[in-house]
Amino acid sequence: MPTTDSARAADIKQPDIKPRSRDVTDGLEKAAARGMLRAVGMGDEDFAKPQIGVASSWNEITPCNLSLDRLAKAVKEGVFAAGGYPLEFGTISVSDGISMGHEGMHFSLVSREVIADSVETVMQAERLDGSVLLAGCDKSLPGMLMAAARLDLASVFLYAGSILPGVAKLSDGSEREVTIIDAFEAVGACARGLMPREDVDAIERAICPGEGACGGMYTANTMASAAEALGMSLPGSAAPPATDRRRDGFARRSGQAVVELLRRGITARDILTKEAFENAIAVVMAFGGSTNAVLHLLAIAHEADVALSLDDFSRIGSKVPHLADVKPFGRHVMTDVDHIGGVPVMMKALLDAGLLNGDCLTVTGATVAQNLAAIAPPDPDGKVLRALSDPLHPTGGITILRGSLAPEGAVVKSAGFDSDVFEGTARVFDGERAALDALEDGTITKGDAVVIRYEGPKGGPGMREMLAITGAIKGAGLGKDVLLLTDGRFSGGTTGLCVGHIAPEAVDAGPIAFLRDGDRIRLDVANRVLDVLVDPAEFDSRRTAFTPPPPRYKTGVLAKYVKLVGSAAIGAVCG
């Protein structure tokens, strides 16, 4: 008898929608585990359902995460509706806005690793089958995506959303739209006598009008856009603000999507391919996004076992134009991107130009090209997002540098440069505080190349962001006249002439450790070169006398971190 189509279909092995949770639900010996699960609400009929971890970085410390408790509830509704059983758990999150400019910032980047480790720990210990990962601020986004890549289960990422811009009423009677970055810059302006204290107060009270992540194309919004481009979040979900009820719909659909991924046997690494990372880099370059995206995409790729390097950023950045007129260098915020159609507008423009891979799989189960065809986003509006025929800059908004000062690499947000070359005289500081003191004393002047070292992943430790000093430099009116270089990082809200992630870092005997006041430093953005103009023999003599400083932390999480963390050039990953 010939085999029928239905018989053939029956012979095809379907994916197990409970690939792990059977370890805690099936068999006589699992009676104790089932008893525990009954206590949290599961009944007999629920033990046949896939168990979905709903991991959230919700807390009350920062507005970035305030909406996540509401969104997690909606995710669980979606999981239930699709036939799964959701189990919610929490992880940490650090507020960079609150931690900036003091000892607390040492603990920011390590929180990325703690988040990834903690999510992995719960998912592995409880044998959960899949996950929806919710995050709202800078390090929680990559931390969640690193966990997804490491676990390689059915996973969907969901962003909390951006804050709305505030409006400050200033002493001259004017009104000004502001974000949190304006507060850092106002401090520098006030210190130089360029702004009255009452205006600083007005800005302080206006910058955060409600819940959501910092509103420009800073680190959180950059990484949310990258997650959408990677295919790890639902199309169109990055741009709507945190207070927009469309987010509840995205949350419910994210819960449904993860169960469907289980049914189809699609896991995170099926989505997180080399081509998907290239798509994410292209979108970050076109938006002129945060330099932190370089660090984080390298780290996520490491967890996904994808070979990604700084050379990939250089290659893609050289052919993808900068299209978005968004803060910190531009005029618009993420809400404006949402108003003109969101991240799909950018992705469709890049796809049409052959700068995006449309065949990459996404959490919808469809490809990038299929998703965009279904959405049919409009063309760029010409103001918030430029057409490819009329870019802000012909190349991407981030440039990878190499040279005698950065043999392994460095990163600059070239979207903010008006000229390609800067040559200045080194003013060398061991740590950010000393540089801030010099700025406040008026001893940093036009033409200086301010070097802040021993702020790398190991030397900091924790690779602190330098928003306090960059904001103060801009506020003091020196943003276009002073070059800032560091083995640390910059906030996604940083503006000005800023080179970060210099590798090797000072504590690892990188060239930045041997700089002295008065050395000449040359930055050539067009040719992607960062050099110190000192005779090599002189530099070698300084190297032989080098002794690294002792570790700043002898106990606790940072003492462990220093022993494990690698170079910024490979994402500052541990292990």
Swiss-Prot record:
- Which keywords does UniProt give here? 2Fe-2S, Amino-acid biosynthesis, Branched-chain amino acid biosynthesis, Iron, Iron-sulfur, Lyase, Magnesium, Metal-binding
Co-factor requirement: [2Fe-2S] cluster; Mg(2+)
A GO BP term, please?
L-valine biosynthetic process
Q: Where is this region: Disordered?
A: 1-25
- Which residues are the active-site ones? S491 (proton acceptor)
SUPFAM superfamilies, per database record: IlvD/EDD N-terminal domain-like, LeuD/IlvD-like
Q: Does the keyword Iron-sulfur apply?
A: yes
Give all N6-carboxylysine modified positions.
K139
Reactions accelerated catalytically: (2R)-2,3-dihydroxy-3-methylbutanoate = 3-methyl-2-oxobutanoate + H2O; (2R,3R)-2,3-dihydroxy-3-methylpentanoate = (S)-3-methyl-2-oxopentanoate + H2O
Q: In which pathway does it act?
A: Amino-acid biosynthesis; L-isoleucine biosynthesis; L-isoleucine from 2-oxobutanoate: step 3/4; Amino-acid biosynthesis; L-valine biosynthesis; L-valine from pyruvate: step 3/4
Q: Which domain of life is it from?
A: Bacteria
Function, please? Functions in the biosynthesis of branched-chain amino acids. Catalyzes the dehydration of (2R,3R)-2,3-dihydroxy-3-methylpentanoate (2,3-dihydroxy-3-methylvalerate) into 2-oxo-3-methylpentanoate (2-oxo-3-methylvalerate) and of (2R)-2,3-dihydroxy-3-methylbutanoate (2,3-dihydroxyisovalerate) into 2-oxo-3-methylbutanoate (2-oxoisovalerate), the penultimate precursor to L-isoleucine and L-valine, respectively.
Under the subunit heading, UniProt states: Homodimer.
Protein name, entry field: Dihydroxy-acid dehydratase
